[in-house]
């Protein structure tokens, strides 16, 4: 009887097509082959389609994310303090304003060290990089400058394409496929500054478990994975939000509605953006202590998650209150201006 080598492209593809999860060794081999440009485009298309059909496991994600993170441009002088990232997988199609970007600056204004890892638009009309660039933040800056900003100001922004040069060769094929792939899930997991805590939004409820398992596998101290009411990849004001809380290697599930935290329940329509100009105006207004109440409340809800994962607050209710108080001031906008000016020099 012939025993097939389990670490070959055909065997790996057959395993995926049979809806079997890959071993860690297979996952590592596949990701390293992508990074070394050893997979033909037609094979890559087949693998990405097979993952999409099977559904990805948390162990597959963590194995591949570790390889991808190690291949990123990682500075030698990483900060000694713990960092938090705030991001979502995208794909909700809701076209909300840039909630997680606002959350990053409000959280930093409240003392949390934020390493925001982001890109241009994935599913919405405007990505975090798009809106920040439109407000004057330089994107293509040296890794040293990015880290220096974090140490000086307590917040920085990492423009994903600048930090993951090994993925450039895959970009045209991913775009030509026209569907979301495993790389859309890996992106939020591979912050090169290696935060120890994270708030991560998913657009589909069936991603809650694999993404939380992946974060655990990558050694995070604390994390929140959230699927928002109405299908948002953020905590929403529209109703019951589904959560996975990771704390000390234990993952627990919870459902929290805005009313549980004294917030208004309102449809996601109230959170919609409308292109780059409008989204930029909304974000600037909020950070400047202005903006409408519903926008402030959804920022406060998601900021409370950041305050919890960072250990700044023990409960979400107190985190919401602190965030709302901050949103009545211009502290967050002043911090944005400091970061913008620092990165521009």
Curated annotation (Swiss-Prot):
Its biological purpose: Catalyzes the transfer of the phosphoribosyl group of 5-phosphorylribose-1-pyrophosphate (PRPP) to anthranilate to yield N-(5'-phosphoribosyl)-anthranilate (PRA).
**Which residues of the sequence carry a binding annotation for anthranilate 1?**
88, 119
EC numbers for this chain: 2.4.2.18
Q: Which NCBIfam families match?
A: trpD (TIGR01245)
**Hey, what's the signal peptide range on this chain?**
none
Q: GO CC terms for this protein? A: cytosol
Q: Cite the HAMAP family for this sequence.
A: TrpD (MF_00211)
- Which top-level group of life is the source organism from? Bacteria
Detail which positions bind Mg(2+) 2: 233-234
Which protein, by its recorded name, is this?
Anthranilate phosphoribosyltransferase
Task: Report the co-factor binding details.
Answer: Binds 2 magnesium ions per monomer.
Q: Which GO terms describe its biological process?
A: L-tryptophan biosynthetic process
Reaction(s) catalysed by this chain, per the record, are: N-(5-phospho-beta-D-ribosyl)anthranilate + diphosphate = 5-phospho-alpha-D-ribose 1-diphosphate + anthranilate
Q: Which InterPro entries match?
A: Anthranilate_Pribosyl_Tfrase (IPR005940), Glycosyl_Trfase_fam3 (IPR000312), Glycosyl_Trfase_fam3_N_dom (IPR017459), Glycosyl_Trfase_fam3_N_dom_sf (IPR036320), Nuc_phospho_transferase (IPR035902)
Name the encoding gene, please. Answer: trpD
Q: In which pathway does it act?
A: Amino-acid biosynthesis; L-tryptophan biosynthesis; L-tryptophan from chorismate: step 2/5
Q: What class of enzyme is it?
A: transferase
Q: Which GO terms fall under molecular function for this chain's record?
A: anthranilate phosphoribosyltransferase activity; magnesium ion binding
Q: Which organism is it from?
A: Prochlorococcus marinus (strain NATL2A)
Q: Where does Mg(2+) 1 bind?
A: 100, 234
Record's SUPFAM superfamilies? Nucleoside phosphorylase/phosphoribosyltransferase catalytic domain, Nucleoside phosphorylase/phosphoribosyltransferase N-terminal domain
Give the UniProt family note. Answer: Belongs to the anthranilate phosphoribosyltransferase family.
